[in-house]
Amino acid sequence: MLFRRFMSAFAMAVLAFWGAAPALANGKDISFEADTVSVNDEDGSMLAVGNVQMKQAGMTLTADVVRYNRDSDRAVANGNVVFVDADGAIHKSDMMVLDTEFTHIVAETLRSRYPDGSFFIADSGDIKTDSISVFDGSRFSPCDCEFENGETPIWDLRATSTRHNVE
């Protein structure tokens, strides 16, 4: 546990040193944990492996592996990716690409469960929290059923492409 805390502090120092998170300047601290973290100064990347968890402004990202690139200011999360937004919605995927403020997320095979029990599934999603999000191969149902375990809702809405405007 002490090692994990050390690595967490080390990763925070690396992120702060690199200027990886503009959110730090906005007073939105990022909490970061992983079993192992390696930094490559030559290509400006960081690799976090095992029980990776990042928290910021009421949002949480967990994954098996997260790769961060300083130049692109993007993180790629792979394996058992779970993103919980500030409203409590749970979004799962095998892979997500995120900016450091969690305001732009690209995901493949997205499965979302909302606090009211409804669910949303998409083959892919380009999510922008402050503008228009686009989803391909989407499906929505207000049914509070276990869709991930194969339960089928009585009805659902399906679309080849869905656009969501936050306004």
Predicted regions: what is each one?
Residues 1-4:
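N-terminal secretory signal peptides that target proteins for export/translocation
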Residues 25-167:
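Structural signature for solvent-exposed beta-strand/loop edge elements and short helix-capping sites
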Residues 8-19:
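Bacterial N-terminal signal peptides
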